[in-house]
Design a protein with these regions (language model features):
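Switch- and interface-adjacent substructures of P-loop NTPase systems
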Residues: 1-116, 125-126
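GTPase G-domain guanine-specificity segment
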Residues: 122-130
Length: 130
């Protein structure tokens, strides 16, 4: 999601050929990625200084046996090199360390100072005060 003069959605194939956008190098990940990649534009003053990237969730269990059709960790590395902050959002009930999760963490290595971790749905746990 990024600032734009009008609200809309730009498909990945159009993003990588637009010389005004920074996404040209993502074309190396092929059509399987570009068909899933898109950018929403919103005319909001908040977005004049930031862009927000939301990646698909990490696959776990049987789902991780399904091939995404593109190099997911390569895409993570590409964005990690260019962003100021990486927010990892986890469901506190499903802290599964799958093979894809491990590869994703490896892809983010070297960007530790940018990473913040948020545990979602923590309110469902009862905490004991020590």
């Amino acid at each position: 999601m990024m600032h734009g003069d009008t609200e809309g959605v730009i498909p990945g194939n159009a993003l990588v050929v637009d010389p005004k956008k920074q996404f040209r190098p993502l074309s190396k990940f092929g059509n399987a990625f570009l068909n899933r990649f898109q950018c929403s534009t919103v005319d909001s003053p908040v977005l004049k200084g930031i862009s927000i990237v939301d990646s698909p969730g990490i696959l776990s269990g049987e789902k991780q046996r399904t091939d995404r059709g593109y190099e997911f960790t390569g895409v993570l590395e590409w964005f990690a090199e260019r962003v100021d902050r990486i927010i990892l959002l986890f469901d506190a009930h499903k802290l599964d360390i799958s093979d894809e999760f491990r590869r994703s963490i490896e892809a983010l290595r070297g960007h530790d100072d940018k990473i913040r971790i948020i545990l979602n749905k923590v309110s469902h746990f009862q905490f004991i005060a020590v």
